[in-house]
Each structure stands twice: as C-alpha cells, then as structure tokens.
Regions:
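Positively charged n-region of N-terminal signal peptides that target proteins for export
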Residues: 1-6
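Bacterial N-terminal signal peptides
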Residues: 7-17
Length: 180
C-alpha cells in the first residue's frame, strides 16, 4: 500500500473516531417522538436519551430506592410518570395513552449518554372517512429537556397527511390528516 493511501486511511480512521465520540449527548435530555397512524391504532414511540450531564438526575427519577438497579417495577413506574407529562387528543377529545412496550438500557449506557429508553404508547381508535386533527403535547422532564416530534408516513394508502405544525421547541405538535 502506498504512503498516500496509508495517510488517507489514517485520516478516515481519525475522523471516524471523532464522529463517534461526539455522538454522545451531553447536557440535554432528548425526548424524540414518532407518531404512527392507522385507522384502528395510533402509536407514539418515545426515545428518551439523557445526556451525560443530566443522566444522574434521570436515574434518580427511575431508581426510586437508590440501590443502583432499575427493577421492572421502577421502569414501569417511570414510564407511567412520563405518560403523565404527555397529552394527546383527536378532534379535541382527550384520549388515554396505554403503555404497550418499554425497554431500558444498562445504567452504564445511560451515564455515557448513549442509552436510549424506548417507550411505546398506543391509542385505540376506530377512525372512519373524514378529516382529523391530532394534538400532542410533551410537558417534558425539566429545563434540560429538548423535544423532537414527527409523523411517520402511513402504511395505509387511505390515510393522507395534510399538515404538521410544531411549536419552536417541538414540545407541542399538531397534525391534520384525512381518511378517504
């Protein structure tokens, strides 16, 4: 291998190590939500990623007895606590969010800023032809929280996204859609 190719490989390796090192969240608690529409079920998938500097605060909220172990009961309680900070309505009617799935990473991953808490909430619906307005609000988890929210492209060809509106911080989201 020529000296030029070796140099190029060294630069690529160095750039790769920088990009992976900078991928860790630092001082924010990212709460990213995707919304998946279907006529009989609306799914909200939250991916919660505490940064290195806020991980201890988040862990204290989850690990209620402070023993350094996140039990299934503590994980479930935290998921329900997150749900209390969410509001969801369809055409002005508030609908309950039901916890369907929750997965928690290892504590070491959370402390490193790479661990993602995954929560899936379902809303049972029986949507018919017509126009719909969905409103979603995430009250978050404190001043270090940042939000992202987006709707996935529907699998059902009769569902049509008409428009999405977000607040500047994306804690508030509105979606207009149509079923034909």
């Amino acid at each position: 291998m020529s000296l030029g190719k070796k140099g190029l490989l060294a630069v690529i390796a160095l750039m790769t190590s920088f990009s992976s090192a900078s991928a860790h969240r630092l001082d924010e608690y990212l709460q990213a939500t995707t919304i998946d529409l279907a006529q009989d079920l609306i799914t909200l998938h939250l991916r919660l990623t505490p940064g290195v500097e806020v991980a201890e605060r988040v862990l204290k909220q989850i690990d209620q007895n402070g023993n350094g172990i996140l039990t299934p009961q503590e994980q479930h309680a935290y998921a329900l606590q997150v749900a209390k900070g969410l509001s969801f309505s369809l055409n002005g009617k508030t609908l309950p969010l039901r916890l369907a799935i929750s997965t928690f990473p290892a504590i070491a991953e959370l402390k490193a800023g790479t661990g993602v808490i995954s929560l899936q909430f379902n809303v049972q619906t029986f949507l018919k032809r017509g126009s719909y307005h969905l409103a979603y609000l995430n009250h978050g988890s404190g001043p270090d929280t940042v939000w992202l929210v987006n709707c996935l492209v529907p699998h059902d060809p009769s569902l049509h996204i008409l428009g999405q509106k977000r607040s500047v911080d994306q804690a508030s989201y509105a979606l207009d859609f149509l079923i034909d």
